[in-house]
């Protein structure tokens, strides 16, 4: 007999707004929920398959919500992949997280699928910078790091000298810069859309504070609910789908030619958009995951919950491997 499904929320900040909201709603939807720091997890692979340990004991779960911060993208994604191998239902997969965090790779995928994106150039060395700046063609322009979140390492440059100086500093720090066209008509404004399994559940416009051109909520920008046009909604859904994201915060700019996709965030913050829209976004995410668990149970692909057997600690796993060797 199947009892309440188990959920692991991978987060380094159990007290963060988004993590607390997801925990609250998951418990309301009947999940037995644990919040675990992904960097406190150990993994093992042997003849019996993939295993995950926390504080010396194995983790058994039916579903996972990864809230993987930028600074632990690669090791965190490795943990997510291990859960996938163990058969857990994961919102979002490791591959989708890695792709969405790589701005140039994500832009390439979206452009190849016909999605509208700003003109963007990735430069590998200072030798390529002058040609890239000429290709963009006009100032001001945007320079950003190829990886980053919440508006970090994003700059607006209004002349060539400052652009060259910034690019040189980024290379010295081991960063790979992206040079991007500036969309004047959307200065200091962008649109954040939350997409959950192919459906828009909430949307807002973000406006920068004062002279700041970055509109991120965590940088002090203001937010308000907006109604998307059919074109904006279609573009947001397609962007999430093409990047393989079950849950995405899609950022778009309004240009004279229509919406342009900037990026899609695999761990979108919930505070700004829940406050702006009054929509229970956390519940929409958890409800979607609960439906996936229900589908698997009905298909007979999910075994009944079982208690962790005595003696299955990581120490016993290592002892059994030594004995078999």
What are these regions (language model features)?
Residues 12-38:
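Short, charged N-terminal beta->alpha structural module
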Residues 70, 265-277:
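Glycine-rich phosphate/pyrophosphate-binding beta-alpha loops
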Residues 10-14, 67-70:
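Structural motif
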């Amino acid at each position: 007999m199947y009892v309440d499904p188990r959920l692991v929320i991978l987060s380094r900040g159990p007290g963060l707004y988004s993590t607390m909201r997801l925990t609250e709603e998951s418990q309301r939807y009947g999940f037995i929920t644990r919040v675990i720091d992904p960097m406190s997890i150990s993994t093992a692979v042997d003849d019996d398959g993939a295993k995950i340990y926390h504080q010396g004991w194995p983790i058994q779960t039916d579903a996972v919500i990864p809230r993987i911060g930028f600074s632990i993208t690669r090791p965190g994604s490795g943990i997510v992949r291990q859960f996938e191998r163990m058969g857990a239902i994961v919102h979002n997969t490791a591959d989708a997280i890695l792709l969405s965090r790589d701005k140039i790779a994500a832009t390439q995928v979206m452009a190849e699928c016909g999605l509208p994106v700003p003109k963007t150039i990735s430069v590998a060395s200072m030798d390529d910078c002058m040609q890239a700046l000429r290709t963009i063609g006009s100032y001001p322009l945007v320079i950003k790091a190829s990886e980053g979140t919440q508006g970090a390492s994003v700059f607006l440059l209004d002349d060539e000298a400052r652009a060259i100086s910034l690019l040189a500093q980024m290379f010295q720090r081991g960063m790979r810069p992206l040079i991007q066209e500036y969309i004047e008509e959307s200065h200091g404004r962008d649109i954040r859309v939350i997409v959950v399994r192919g459906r828009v559940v909430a949307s807002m416009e973000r406006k920068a504070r004062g002279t700041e051109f970055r509109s991120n909520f965590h940088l002090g920008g203001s937010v308000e609910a907006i109604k998307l046009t059919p074109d904006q909604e279609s573009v947001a859904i397609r962007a999430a789908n093409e990047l393989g994201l079950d849950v995405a915060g899609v950022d778009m700019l309004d240009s004279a030619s229509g919406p342009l996709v900037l990026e899609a965030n695999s761990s979108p913050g919930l505070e700004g958009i829940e406050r702006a829209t009054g929509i229970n976004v956390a519940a929409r995410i958890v409800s979607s995951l609960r439906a996936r668990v229900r589908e698997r149970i009905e298909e007979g692909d999910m075994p009944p919950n079982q208690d962790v057997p005595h003696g299955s600690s990581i120490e016993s796993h290592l002892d059994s491997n030594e004995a078999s060797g």
